Amino acid sequence: DKSGTTAEDTAATVTMSATDIESDALTYSIVATPDNGSLGSVSGATVVYTPSTNYNGFDTFTYKVTDANNGVSNIATVTMTVTAVNDVPTTDNGSVTTAEDTAVNVTLNASDVDGDALTYAVGTATNGTVTVSGNTATYTPNAHFNGTDSFTFTASDGTLTSDSSTITVTVTAVNDIPVANDITVTTVEDTEVTITLSATDVEDSTFTFAAVELPDNGTLGTVGSTVVYTPNQHYNGSDTFTYTATDSNSGVSTEATVSITVTAVNDVPTTDNGSVTT
C-alpha cells in the first residue's frame, strides 16, 4: 500500500511499488479508480492523480502488478490526502432599475466554495452615491439624473479578495414639476402695471401660466407670460394674487404669489355748482 499528499486543486504524481523475488519486469495497472479525483495513464510505475475541483479530504484508488510470467499480485491501495486550500470568493455582475431621484437597494451576489463568511466593498458611481451594509448596496442617483450608471464591488473572505464585478443601474426619467416664482411689483393709484410671470424647471423652459386666486382690490387682464393688473379706482395699499405654471409634460407647480403695492396719489378736490335766491 502507498500514501501520498497533495494540495486542493493540485495534481500529484504517485509512484506505485512492488517487489518480485525473481526481479521480473513488472506491469502496473489500475483496479479501482478514485471517488474524488481522476487518474492519468499509467507510465511505468507512476500515475498522475488529480483531485476533483475544490475537493479536500481523503481519497483512494487501487492497483495490481503483473510480472513477465503473468503472475498477478495482490491488490494494493493508494491513500491520498488532499489538503484544503483557501479559495478566492467569486462575484456576479448584476443590474437594477430605479426612478429619477429615488434610491434603490441591490443584493450583491457572491459565493465561496469554502463557506467562509464574506465582507463586501463597493466602488464609486459617476452619477450617484453608493453605500454598503452586509451584502446589500444602496445606490442613490444624483438629483435629477436619469440614464445609465454603474459601480463595482468585491467580496473578501478575510484573506483573499475576489475580482471586481459590476452592478449596472438604469435610472428612468421622471418629470420634475416647475417652480413658479414669487413676484413683487409697485404701481401708483389708478395706474395699471404689466407683470411678467416666471418659473424654473430643470427639464423645460416653456410654460403655461394660470391665475388661481384673484386680487381683492383690482382686476387682471388675460394671463399669458405677462398679465396686466389694474387697481380699483382710487385704491391704494397692498394687493395680491396667486398663479401656477404648467410645463410641456403637464406638470403643474405649486402656487406662487404676486405682491402688489399701490402707492397713493393726491386726488384733486372736486366742487359742485350751486344757486341761491334773495
Language-model-detected regions and their locations in the chain:
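Extracellular ectodomain surface segments
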Residues: 1-33, 52, 87-125, 142, ...
